[in-house]
């Protein structure tokens, strides 16, 4: 199973708004496409939003991620949640045990 850590630096003053929009728009669409959301957190000290998502299905991660970004539902999100993201980091992570 592939697990990805995503860390978004959010524009100042928009962290709570971003978290709400993520919960209402991004999370449901990711889950609909087959991703599993393992958790999400806000980091107020650094104005960041971190979340873990996984996928263990027949398609590749890249195929599913592309489907998310190209979906009509993603293009129809208003307001566009990406407007509040200043920086994106994402890493595939491996368990220690």
Regions found by a protein language model. Give the residues of each.
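Short, structured motif recognition centered on aromatic/hydrophobic residues
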Residues: 2-7, 29-30, 49-52
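An amphipathic, aromatic/His-enriched active-site/gating alpha helix that lines ligand/cofactor pockets
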Residues: 17-38, 54-91, 96-97
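Trp/Gly-enriched beta-strand/coil motifs that build multi-repeat beta-propeller-like domains
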Residues: 40-42
């Amino acid at each position: 199973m592939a697990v990805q850590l995503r860390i978004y630096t959010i524009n100042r003053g928009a962290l709570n708004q971003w978290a709400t929009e993520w919960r209402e728009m991004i999370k449901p669409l990711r889950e609909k496409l087959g991703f599993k959301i393992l958790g999400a957190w806000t980091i107020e000290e650094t104005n960041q939003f971190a979340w873990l998502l996984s996928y263990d299905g027949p398609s590749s991660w890249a195929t599913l991620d592309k489907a998310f970004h190209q979906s009509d539902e993603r293009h129809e999100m208003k307001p566009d949640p990406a407007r509040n993201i200043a920086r994106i980091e994402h890493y595939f992570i491996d368990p220690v045990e």
